[in-house]
Each structure stands twice: as C-alpha cells, then as structure tokens.
Amino acid sequence: MPNIKSAKRRVKISERNRLINKAYKTRMKNSIKKVLLALSEGKTKEEVEQLYKIAQSAIDKAAKIGAVHKNEAARRKSRLMSKINKHFAIE
C-alpha cells in the first residue's frame, strides 16, 4: 500500500491504464479468433479478407496506444495473413 501521495495517484492511473490495455487486447484477440473461425468454417476469401481488415485495425490500434509492442503487432498480422494465404492456396 503506497504511503506517498504521488504513489497513491500512480496506483489509480496504472489501474485505469491496465483496464484500457485489457480492453484493447481483448478486442484484438477476439477479432483474430473471428478470422480463424471463418477459415475453419470455410467462408469465402472475400469474407475472410473483410474480417482480416477489422483484425488488422484492432491490432494496429492496440500497438498505437502501447497495449502491445509494435513488433508483436507486426508478428500477429504476419502470422494471421500467412494462415489465410496457406488456407486459400490449398483450395
């Protein structure tokens, strides 16, 4: 438990930031799951690409505010796109 006034304020700020980061990460992970679910359900390429654009936006927003590192965001987008390309190359 912090005793100094500034430390007490920092506890409030860090809790607020934790919740904001958690929301961005959850949005990012859910959008990635939607893309992977669409692939497993056999949706068309156009539908999957539309979902990928939404996921890409969510990943970029999470990286922009610092919820995830920019390299992690790039890696997630790259891996997701390679899964999409691999799936549609088989067909």
From Swiss-Prot:
Signal peptide: which range, if any? none
This protein's GO CC annotations: cytosol; small ribosomal subunit
Keyword Transmembrane: yes or no? no
Q: Which Pfam families match?
A: Ribosomal_S20p (PF01649)
A single Gene Ontology MF term assigned here is: small ribosomal subunit rRNA binding
Alphabetically ordered keywords of this record: Ribonucleoprotein, Ribosomal protein, RNA-binding, rRNA-binding
Q: Which residues cross the membrane?
A: none
Question: Is RNA-binding set as a keyword in this record?
Answer: yes
Gene Ontology biological process terms from the UniProt entry: translation
Family label: Belongs to the bacterial ribosomal protein bS20 family.
The protein's job, in short, is: Binds directly to 16S ribosomal RNA.
Q: Please give the name of this protein.
A: Small ribosomal subunit protein bS20
- Give the organism, scientific name: Thermosipho melanesiensis (strain DSM 12029 / CIP 104789 / BI429)
Q: What is the lineage of its organism?
A: Bacteria, Thermotogati, Thermotogota, Thermotogae, Thermotogales
